[in-house]
Structure formats: structure tokens, C-alpha cells
Amino acid sequence: MKTFPVSIVTPDGPVYEKEVEMVSVKAESGEMGILPGHIPTVAPLKISAVRLKNGGHTDYVAVSGGFIEVRPDKVTVLSSSAEEANHIDIHRANEAKRRAEQRLQDKQAHVDFKRAEMALQRAVNRLNVSDMK
């Protein structure tokens, strides 16, 4: 099957750069599956896992939202943070989840609930993706 290059990039640099047969992402508008030769598209992403298939192997990368740019010959994912499943520090992700849950339980006016909810979503996503390795 044909392949195409995929780059997942954060402000700190590239996280994933390989040739794949298919990319699956969760865009704000729904699930997207991208194969070689896909029409050009740009879409905002949800906090989720990016699935990258090549042959019988699937890689998973946790992304904290961002954008996907699809060109017929290349796919680029831009995200504020991204981690491959096998590089996720499970202890750190559990601690982030615990802290976010604690902030959400605090009924104090100074707590930014939207920010705490986003932190919880990112931590849960990282834990879910780490289970996919």
C-alpha cells in the first residue's frame, strides 16, 4: 500500500516523523481518516490520540488539540504538546490528573474551572494513550 510522510510538531520541535499508510484523528467536526492522495484540508483537533498505521503496526501519539494540515503528499499535525505512547510518563500523568481533579473539587472563586477541565482532559488522554502502546 502507498505511504506518505507525517509530521507531528510542537513548539519544542518534531515529536513524530515517519511514513505511514493511514492517519486517524479526532477533529472538532468528527473523526477523520486520511489516506495517500487525500484532498487538501485544514481542521482543528480535539485533545485525543492520533493513530498512525503502517502495515500491521499502529503508533499512537497523544495530542493536546491543535490543527491538522493535509496535503495530497504530506500530513502535518501542529499541537502545543504531543507525546508518543511509549514516551508518556504514567506517574506524571496520574499526578496531573489528581491535581486537576483536586482543583475541580475546590469550590473557590479563584479556581479557573475551564483551565482545570482542560488539564484533566489532557491528563486522561495521556493515560489512555499510554495504555495503547
From Swiss-Prot:
GO biological process: proton motive force-driven ATP synthesis
SUPFAM superfamilies: Epsilon subunit of F1F0-ATP synthase C-terminal domain, Epsilon subunit of F1F0-ATP synthase N-terminal domain
Gene Ontology annotations for the cellular component aspect, listed alphabetically: plasma membrane; proton-transporting ATP synthase complex
Topology term for the membrane: Peripheral membrane protein
Chain segments annotated as coiled-coil in the UniProt record: none
Record-linked CDD domains: F1-ATPase_delta
One MF annotation (Gene Ontology) recorded for this entry: proton-transporting ATP synthase activity, rotational mechanism
Subcellular location: Cell membrane
Gene3D superfamilies: ATP synthase delta/epsilon subunit, C-terminal domain, F0F1 ATP synthase delta/epsilon subunit, N-terminal
Keywords, in A-Z order: ATP synthesis, Cell membrane, CF(1), Hydrogen ion transport, Ion transport, Membrane, Transport
Listed HAMAP family: ATP_synth_epsil_bac
Similarity annotation: Belongs to the ATPase epsilon chain family.
Subunit structure: F-type ATPases have 2 components, CF(1) - the catalytic core - and CF(0) - the membrane proton channel. CF(1) has five subunits: alpha(3), beta(3), gamma(1), delta(1), epsilon(1). CF(0) has three main subunits: a, b and c.
UniProt-listed PANTHER family: ATP SYNTHASE DELTA/EPSILON CHAIN, ATP SYNTHASE EPSILON CHAIN, CHLOROPLASTIC
Function statement: Produces ATP from ADP in the presence of a proton gradient across the membrane.
NCBIfam families per UniProt: ATP_synt_epsi, PRK00571.1-3, PRK13446.1
Name the record gives this protein: ATP synthase epsilon chain
Annotated source species: Bacillus cereus (strain ATCC 14579 / DSM 31 / CCUG 7414 / JCM 2152 / NBRC 15305 / NCIMB 9373 / NCTC 2599 / NRRL B-3711)
Taxonomic classification: Bacteria, Bacillati, Bacillota, Bacilli, Bacillales
